[in-house]
Amino acid sequence: MRAAVVGGSLGGLHAALLLQDIGVEVDVYERSPAELTERGAGIGFLPESARYLVERAGVPLDRISVATSRIRYLDRRGERIYDGAHVYRFSSWNTVYRALKARLEPVRYHLGHEMTGWAGTDDAVEVHLASRSARRVDLLVCADGVGSIARARLLPAVRPVYAGYVAWRGMVPEASLDAATRAALADAITYHVYANSHILAYPIPGPDGSVAPGERLMNFVWYRNYLEGGDLDGVLTDDAGQRRELSVPPGAVAARHVAEMRGVAQARLPAPIARVVERVERPFLQVIYDIEVPRMAFGRVCLLGDAAFVVRPHAAAGTAKAAADAWALAEAIARETDVPTALSHWESEQLALGAQLLERTRRIGRRSQVDGNWVPGDPELIFGLRGPGR
């Protein structure tokens, strides 16, 4: 069997590796002409996200992630108002990407290969690429992310729904923080919640993947409301005057918005978290959208990860959902050699998983950004793919 995976990010790599492991001949087609770097910051490293690297690649968790043992909340003065025991693991997009990609044969990963379309028959799918070449395969896995070309073609009525807020993000070297700040944030994911907003900070591996204290990065995610229209358009207009759709990458956020963000941090956030925000040199931002799909399987073609459901980050489960989709896909293909039948069986469970995760992250987001009833220590807020802590 031959398969093409469109999209060379974490979801696409999981799909390619797991299909490869059951004997499928797989090629990954990534539209970016350059190696994917700086495409993400910190990620919650749930068991599903780590499973392939631990079970199949034998990579020790402590080599690719940072463990924290506390969930901590600070008030405006920087005093601890909640400090509960709970173990999380955090990694970085780059660390996980490098580890997964190292498991795939280099000749199977094709940069600068954008899919322009496909034509399907009962027996195969012909994938068309921008280079005017084509590939004939038995299975097409579309893992092309939030702005999925495949989703737009297969489900043209599905549109991103703006959640009403944006995530400001950034990372700073742990070693650049003063001792008091490091102590306040030590061994924890640290939150501050205030009216219609919240921010969290946690340690992740350093730029070279180091997990040694002092060589790591401190990552923050700050959710801030922007009215659709002028306010949102303004913050998404980059330093070159271009209005972005989904995110503004590091180094491209307009200087006036960076200055405003730092000013609000200094005026409104607890000092330890504010110092992290102020020291970040190249903050970036992503718009928070909901995307829900009614289908994920279309004959010999499927949507996987963010190409299907796009969920808010509050469960730290976006990467885990893509990995779970990939594991289930490989298991379905291994059980059933008829690809359309396998995809039909695979689809029902993944649709249910995506729908419950989307609804749960909507509820969590509403609690902080709209209703103001986010309670520190509430077990419903624990990260997890299938439910709090699950």
What is each of the regions a protein language model found here?
Residues 1-2, 233-250, 258-263, 331, ...:
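Helical substrate-recognition/capping region of FAD-dependent monooxygenase/halogenase enzymes
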Residues 4, 23-28, 32-38, 42-44, ...:
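FAD-dinucleotide binding site
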Residues 5-21, 25, 32, 141-142, ...:
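Conserved mid-domain beta->alpha element of the FAD-binding
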Residues 23, 68, 106-107, 137-138, ...:
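Short, well-ordered alpha-helix to beta-strand connector turns
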Residues 32-104, 368:
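Active-site-adjacent segment of FAD-dependent monooxygenases/related oxidoreductases
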Residues 59, 79-80, 87, 98-258, ...:
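Conserved FAD-binding catalytic core of PHBH/FMO-like flavoproteins
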Residues 232-237, 272-283:
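Short acidic alpha-helical/loop segments enriched in Asp/Glu that coordinate divalent cations
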